[in-house]
Amino acid sequence: MDSGKLYSFAFKGLLTEEALDKAGRKSKDDFSAVWESETSKRLGLSLMDEEFVVKSRRMAVVYTAICSFENSVREFIAKKLLEEKGENWWDLCVKKEIRTNAENRKKSEKDVRWLTARGNSMIYYTEFGDLISIMAKSENWKFFEVHVGKIEWAKQIIETLEKSRNIIMHSGELAPTDIERVGMYIRDWIRQVG
């Protein structure tokens, strides 16, 4: 492709972006605000005690960070084991007890057909703490050591975040120092593991 055609293509793309913005294109942030407003109405948040709603919204931000972190660790483990052991990694790399618990959880949730499934991989049916057991299993550790460094470090992060998540999930509120710790651990993990 010659440079004139490439320039024309890129310039037309920029003009299209500008026209869409002027026409009122919704950004992902706008979508989130609209979705939150509509969902709040559907849930009847305006009927609830404002103090509880405010506290819950503060913790929702923290929960979002922890949930995103947890799912990124799940994906990291699943991708690494798929890459190293192939399609059958779940059976080869996960202890029977963890597999059985996850399979029972999936079956139990499947019996409630109106409830949305957690995910398309069995790793989404494990508990947060199980992720450490999967990484630390002697046959698996060599795949993770290069990324994680020390399993004790990863265990401390996951256990702390799991406890923090449980406080939020059971209607508790984390102190500002606890929130800072959650953020610190997530940032440390991302810097170390990616």
Give the location of each predicted region:
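Amphipathic alpha-helical interface elements
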Residues: 1-194
